[in-house]
């Protein structure tokens, strides 16, 4: 894992300094394309002014040395540029006065803090104790009075007072400048007409803070420092086992059960790293956020190369490779057509280098990045393989339903076919979906029974309109059709094996139904359930016309927890009665007869489980319903 990241970092540091490589990108426009602005808090000896005139561009983050926030959830925030105003209204200036920048900068910062900030009380944590005196921007605003009124109603909760400050600050912006906080993408501190981030003393402190780690000390006389080597490059110089500067949590080093010999002083045996490799990792982590971060549904992930040979010499070569990887990934993530893929797919290999692709699913929490799943050494041809399998699966479904079907299986579509529990767009149950992606990308087998169980879980979400899932609750029949397409896709990818297909020449059903069964490769038991589902679909179509409503009472006969073998005969008899009741039995007698024959011949040796029974019943229901929908659309054209 770390080897690929260090390779990236080394290329980045070849032509640029570490501090330049720590600069984070920010959006320069809002969702409507309007440019964000820079809000400058301009402190001088006697005055505080706001400047809102500068528009952001791609160089703004470099100009103001934007490197994000200080490491750790409770770390003092002292950086002079930030994407939110909050810290500048409270703790930043106080924290700056606690850093030794040398004179005259120390004196300037102390003067600004003492003049322009109010002490709200010694009993308050330093993080929330101080507040910018907004009367310098609007004489009608009394911050101390605001705090007194707030604290009377919210005793002990000083953190929330920051929201009150923000609201008052925004009122000043609206009143004096006609702008809102949402119109700014970056906030910066100026001192005597210059951005604090341009002061050389400030830059040096940032660099020292970001890169310095505690040097490894021997824990006993027996331990020979010369025996320690960097786990990445083998160096014996400038070693550390302090990994706190890394944003991504590669190793657990805060729980005693993960320490060597269960000794808290022996975490160093898990991971020791030299300063050069640490710098490379820090540079690469910023690059991951800037260039290699993407989403798959509600899942966050990084995609990055691991060079087997031919490492990039510098950032320009690295950018070239990375752009090709990300562009190829984005196409198979949202595959609109295979033709598009064939036109846009990039040749991402050459004779001078060979690399594999790593997928790192992660979650950011409290400024730490925890790895949820690391899928390593994925071959480059995976993108072509996915596009080809998607094309084949779509062709199979189109042949099966004998209609044009403008849907492809891609990485994003898969996410919305497999039920995942979510809360406020945060994935809370992710093991199966990550297992699935790992097996898909590494060509490992996927268990069909478990997958069909997930399809049934999703069908239940749709039918019962359950909340808290990633599944779109619109169309059960199209969901089931797409699930069948996913099965064919996985067969083409090699993750699933196909079974023995029923000889449809022995069936008396309509030719279009025979065609569907043979094209989808259903066996006898699957076909029996499919035909039962077709009959349920036809009853549903009749009920839809009769009641002129989306509600189809026949679906109440289905148990969405699964249908076991003992309930199949009962369901078949109920379907027969409903065909009579709807007065459509004469149109579907052959279908019922074939279903009953296949059922009777296989019942003693029935192999399908309750979820598989329901899935193939729903597949038949889906087919009958979609054929009617498509026919209606064609007639209306």
Describe the predicted segments one by one.
Residues 245-256, 289-300:
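Short cysteine/histidine-rich metal-coordination sites, predominantly Zn2+-binding motifs
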Residues 1-185, 198, 240, 284, ...:
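Extended alpha-helical scaffolding segments
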Residues 224-228, 236, 271:
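Residues immediately within or flanking Cys/His clusters that coordinate Zn2+
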Residues 207-208, 227-232:
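Active-site-proximal segments of catalytic enzyme domains
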Residues 260-279:
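Short beta-strand-alpha-helix junction that forms the catalytic/metal-binding core
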Residues 230-234, 274-277:
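Short cysteine-rich clusters marking metal-coordination/redox-active sites
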Residues 237-239, 279-282:
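Short functional micro-motifs and their immediate structural scaffolds
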Residues 198-219, 252-260:
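Short Cys/His-rich Zn2+-coordinating modules
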């Amino acid at each position: 894992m770390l080897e690929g990241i260090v390779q990236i970092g080394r290329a980045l540091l070849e032509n640029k300094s570490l501090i330049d490589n720590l600069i984070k990108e920010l959006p320069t426009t809002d969702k409507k394309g309007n440019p964000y602005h820079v809000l400058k808090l301009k402190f001088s000896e006697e005055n505080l002014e706001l400047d809102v005139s500068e528009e952001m561009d791609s160089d703004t983050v470099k100009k103001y040395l934007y490197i994000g926030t200080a490491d750790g959830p409770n770390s003092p925030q002292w950086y002079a540029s930030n994407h939110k105003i909050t810290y500048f209204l409270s703790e930043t200036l106080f924290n700056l006065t606690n850093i030794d920048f040398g004179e005259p900068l120390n004196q300037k910062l102390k003067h600004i803090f003492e003049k322009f900030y109010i002490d709200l009380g010694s009993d308050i944590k330093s993080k929330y104790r101080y507040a910018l005196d907004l009367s310098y921007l609007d004489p009608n605003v009394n911050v101390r009075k605001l705090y007194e009124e707030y604290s009377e109603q919210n005793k002990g909760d000083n953190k929330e007072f920051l929201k009150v400050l923000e609201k008052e600050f925004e009122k000043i912006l609206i009143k004096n400048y006609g702008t809102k906080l949402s119109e700014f993408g970056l906030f910066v501190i100026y001192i005597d007409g210059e951005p604090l981030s341009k002061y050389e003393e400030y830059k040096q402190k940032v660099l020292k803070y970001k890169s310095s780690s505690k040097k490894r000390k021997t824990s006993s006389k027996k331990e020979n420092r010369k025996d320690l080597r960097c786990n990445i490059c083998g160096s014996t110089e400038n070693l550390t086992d302090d990994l706190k500067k890394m944003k991504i949590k590669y190793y657990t080093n805060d729980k005693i059960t993960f320490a060597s010999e269960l000794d808290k002083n022996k975490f160093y045996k898990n991971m020791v790293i030299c300063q050069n490799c640490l710098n490379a990792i820090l540079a690469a982590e910023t690059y991951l956020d800037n260039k290699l971060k993407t989403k798959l549904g509600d899942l966050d992930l990084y995609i990055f190369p691991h060079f087997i040979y031919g490492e990039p010499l510098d950032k320009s070569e690295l950018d070239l490779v990375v752009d090709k990887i990300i562009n190829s990934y984005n196409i198979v993530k949202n595959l609109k057509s295979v033709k598009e893929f064939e036109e846009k797919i990039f040749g991402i290999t050459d004779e001078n280098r060979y690399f594999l692709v790593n997928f790192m699913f992660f979650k950011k929490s409290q400024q730490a990045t925890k790895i949820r799943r690391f899928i390593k050494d994925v071959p480059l041809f995976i993108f072509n393989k996915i596009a080809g399998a998607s094309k084949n699966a779509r062709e199979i479904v189109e042949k099966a339903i004998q209609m044009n079907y403008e849907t492809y299986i891609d990485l994003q579509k898969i996410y919305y076919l497999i039920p995942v529990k979510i809360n406020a767009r945060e994935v809370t149950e992710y093991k199966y979906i990550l297992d699935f992606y790992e097996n898909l990308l590494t060509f490992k087998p996927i268990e069909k029974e478990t997958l069909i169980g997930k399809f049934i879980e999703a069908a239940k979400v749709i039918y019962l309109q359950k909340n808290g899932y990633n599944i779109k609750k619109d169309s059960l029949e199209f969901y089931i059709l797409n699930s069948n397409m996913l099965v064919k896709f996985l067969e083409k990818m090699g993750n699933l094996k196909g079974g023995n297909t029923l000889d449809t020449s022995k069936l008396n059903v309509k030719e279009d139904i025979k065609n569907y069964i043979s094209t989808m490769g259903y066996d006898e038991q699957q076909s029996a359930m499919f035909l039962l589902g077709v009959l349920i679909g036809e009853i549903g179509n009749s009920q839809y016309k009769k009641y002129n409503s989306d509600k189809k009472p026949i679906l109440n006969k289905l148990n969405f927890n699964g249908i076991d073998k003992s309930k199949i005969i009962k369901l078949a008899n109920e379907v027969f009665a409903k065909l009579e009741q709807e007065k459509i039995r004469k149109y579907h007698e052959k279908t019922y007869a074939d279903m009953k024959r296949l059922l009777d011949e296989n019942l003693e040796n029935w192999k399908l489980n309750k979820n598989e029974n329901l899935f193939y019943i729903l597949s038949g229901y889906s087919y009958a319903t979609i054929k009617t929908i498509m026919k209606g659309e064609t007639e209306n054209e």
